[in-house]
Amino acid sequence: MSEAISLTFPDGSVRSYPAGTTGREVAESISKSLAKKAVAIALDGTVRDLSETITDGKIEIVTREDGRALELIRHDAAHVMAEAVQELWPGTQVTIGPVIENGFYYDFAKNEPFTPEDLPKIEKRMKEIIQRNKPFTREIWSREKAKEVFAAKGENYKVELVDAIPEGQDLKIYYQGDWFDLCRGPHMASTGQIGTAFKLMKVAGAYWRGDSNNAMLSRIYGTAWATQEELDNYLHVLAEAEKRDHRRLGREMDLFHFQEEGPGVVFWHGKGWRMFQTLTAYMRRRLANTYQEVNAPQVLDKSLWETSGHWGWYQENMFAVKSAHAFTHPDDKEADQRVFALKPMNCPGHVQIFKHGLKSYREMPVRLAEFGNVHRYEASGALHGLMRVRGFTQDDAHVFCTEEQMAAECLRINDLILSVYEDFGFSEIVVKLSTRPEKRVGSDDLWDRAESVMLEVLKTIEEQSGGRIKTGILPGEGAFYGPKFEYTLKDAIGREWQCGTTQVDFNLPERFGAFYIDQNSEKTQPVMIHRAICGSMERFLGILIENFAGHMPLWFAPLQVVVATITSDADDYGREVAEALREAGMAVETDFRNEKINYKVREHSVTKVPVIIVCGRKEAEERTVNIRRLGSQNQTSMSLEEAITSLVDEATPPDVKRKLAAKKQLA
C-alpha cells in the first residue's frame, strides 16, 4: 500500500492523505462542523460508510441534506425496526429488509402475524433505540462463523441467506449497539442520525423469497424522510391518493367493475364506456387527415410471433389459444392443432399492412393508427384496477418513413403528444431520450445516426417550449431495437406517470422483410417509429380519474348534467329542459324522485356529476334554471336558452373549440 492517497474534491481541488484514512477523518480535516453533519461519503460516486478506509478517487462528503442520504435513512430505519421487533417479541426471526420506493419493509418469521395495532408499539420502541444513538459498526465474518452464530440464535432464514452468498464474497455484519444483522451496507454513523421523521404504514403477508410453496412471513412497511415536513407532505399525498383512488371512484361513479371470472379485464358500465368513447372520439379527431386508421386481427398464428421475435422474448406475457376441440383432444391428429396467440402488441400487424402492396418513396411516410385491443399476461398479484390489466386498448400508431424523414416525424409526433396532454390539463411534462443498451440489434453506425437525430429533436423540443418542457437523457435505457423518447406527466398531487413513447425500430422491418422502392429503384428498409400517446387507454382513464379526483371537465364527464325537480308540478318543465340539453348534444339524466332537493344534490355530488340543474315551480313559470356546480355552494339562475348556450360551449372539446375559432378567424 502506498504511503499516501490522493482525493479529488467537488471543487476540483486535490489533497493527499495518509494511507488508511477513513471518510470521517477526511470530513474532520475540512471542518468539525462538516464532520458533525456527515453521514457517509461518496467515493467515485459510490456511497460508503464514514468508517471505511478509502483509496484514491473523487470524494464527496454526504450530509443528511444530500438526496443520497435518504436511502441511508430508510435503510437504517429498517434495521432499527428489526431490532425493535426482536426486543418486543423475542424469538421472532428477521429475514430481509430492503429499501423500496418511498420507504422500506422487513419480513419477519413470527408465530402470530403482526396486526395494525402493533405498529404504534414498534414505532415507540424505534424512537427509544434512535435516542440511544448507538454507533453502526461493521465486521467481516467468515461463512462458518456467520452460520454458527445465526444458527445458535435460531435465525434459520439468515443461515439460508448466508448459504446463498457466493463463495469468496465478504460477509458483512453491521452492529448497532449489541444488535446485529447480515447486511451489505452502507449505514450512517449512528442510530441517532435517522431522526424521527418516520412512520410504520401497514402490515401484510409475504412468502419467503416470493414463492407460494414457502412459509408465509409477516411484513411491516414503513416510510422515512429527512425532515418532518417531508414526511407530512408524503402522508398528505398518500391521503389525497386514497381519496382519488380510481377504483373507489369507479364504483361511486358507476363507471366499471372487475370480477373473478375475468381477472384483469374491465366490465365497462354505461357511464364509463361513454367516457372511454369520448376519449376515443377525441383521439380520432386528433389523428384525422394525418393517419390512416387500420385494424389488425387480434388472433394470429404462432409463426407470425416467431418471426417478430415475440414468441421468443415475450412468450411468458402472451396468451396462446387453440380451438376448444384441439384443447380437449390434444392427441386428435385430424383436429386443427395450430397454436394461435392473442396479440400483445399491434406492431407486427401494422408491418403486414405496410407490406401489402408495393410502396414508393413518394408515398413515404406511411402513418398507420389503431385503437387495438391487446392482451398481456400479468401475475394476479400485479393487477391494479385500470392501471395494470390483462386486456386493454392501445392508441397505437406506427410511422414508416425514410431515414431523412425521421427527425420531422419525431417532431410531428411530439407536437401531437404535448397538445393532447395539455388539452387534459397536464402542464408539467418531462421528455427523456433513452439511448442504446448493451444488448441491441443494428450497427453502431445506425445507432449513431438515430441517436444524433433524436438528440437534435430533444434539443428542439426544449427550445420550442421555451424551457417549459423539461428534457433529459436515460443512458442505456433504450429498447434493444432502437432509441426512444419517454413522456412523463405530473398530476394534480405531484405524482409522475410515464405515458407516451416515441420509439425508433431497426428490428421489426428487417425481420418481416419490409421495404419501399427508393429514388434509385432499389429496395430500402424503412425506419419504423412506434408511437403511443395514452399508451393504455384504460390506464390513461385511470390517471385522469385520479388527477381530477372524479371531478372531470364538463366536456369529458361521463354524465354531464342531472336535471332535478323540487316538486312534481315542475316535472314536465324538467323533461323539457333535459330534452333541450340532449338535443344540444349533452349527456343528461333526470331525477324526479319524491325526495328533498338537498338530498338529491348530495347524492349526485357523490357520483361527481359536474352540473345539477334544479327546477321548481318558480323556474317553470319564468322558464329559467338554477345551476349548481360540483364542489361549489354558489347557485346561478339564468334563462333556459342562456344555460344551454353556456353549457354547450363549456362542453365543447378543446380541439373542436380550436377548429371553430380558426374557422371564425377565416370568415
Swiss-Prot record:
Main location: cytoplasm
Region of interest: Catalytic: 245-553
Catalysed conversion reaction: tRNA(Thr) + L-threonine + ATP = L-threonyl-tRNA(Thr) + AMP + diphosphate + H(+)
Signal peptide limits: none
Subcellular location: Cytoplasm
Keyword Nucleotide-binding: yes
GO cellular component, one term: cytosol
Cofactor(s) it depends on: Zn(2+)
MF terms (GO), sorted A to Z: ATP binding; metal ion binding; threonine-tRNA ligase activity; tRNA binding
Superkingdom in the source lineage: Bacteria
Similarity annotation: Belongs to the class-II aminoacyl-tRNA synthetase family.
HAMAP family the record matches: Thr_tRNA_synth (MF_00184)
Function, in words: Catalyzes the attachment of threonine to tRNA(Thr) in a two-step reaction: L-threonine is first activated by ATP to form Thr-AMP and then transferred to the acceptor end of tRNA(Thr). Also edits incorrectly charged L-seryl-tRNA(Thr).
Subunit annotation: Homodimer.
Protein name (database record): Threonine--tRNA ligase
Source organism of this protein record: Agrobacterium fabrum (strain C58 / ATCC 33970) (Agrobacterium tumefaciens (strain C58))
Record gene name: thrS
